[in-house]
């Protein structure tokens, strides 16, 4: 498992809002450093889950559209071109928006984890 972003600056720390949102759940992002999504990273993956349609388009431009899905679509069992809602980006938002986004992502990841075992992703 790797994490990368299309607007990330390599080595950046998580935003203050993200750091505070995870503390409520006894998690720690202080060691997290951003990684820019490159063609090399995209080609390494056998599954890329993105938060928005814009992210999906960027991954497709890197040549990894076939292994990519919007996380909301994948979690709902509708990957393969079906696009559901994007995950809202809380950047610059309120603490409440960061907390709500954390909850949404946590729920989506739980659903994704239930799916990837039977599908044979490793």
Regions found by a protein language model. Name each.
Residues 47, 53-122:
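Phosphate-binding/catalytic loops
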């Amino acid at each position: 498992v790797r994490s990368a972003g299309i607007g990330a600056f390599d080595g950046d720390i998580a935003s203050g809002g993200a750091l505070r949102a995870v503390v409520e759940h006894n998690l720690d992002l202080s060691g997290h450093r951003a990684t820019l999504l490159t063609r090399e990273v995209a080609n390494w993956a056998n599954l890329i889950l993105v938060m928005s349609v814009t992210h999906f388009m960027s991954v497709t431009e890197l040549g990894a559209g076939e292994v990519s899905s919007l996380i909301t679509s994948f979690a709902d069992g509708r990957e393969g071109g079906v696009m559901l809602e994007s995950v809202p980006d809380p950047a610059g938002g309120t603490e409440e928006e960061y907390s709500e986004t954390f909850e949404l992502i946590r729920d989506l990841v739980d659903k994704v984890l239930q799916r990837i075992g039977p599908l044979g992703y490793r």
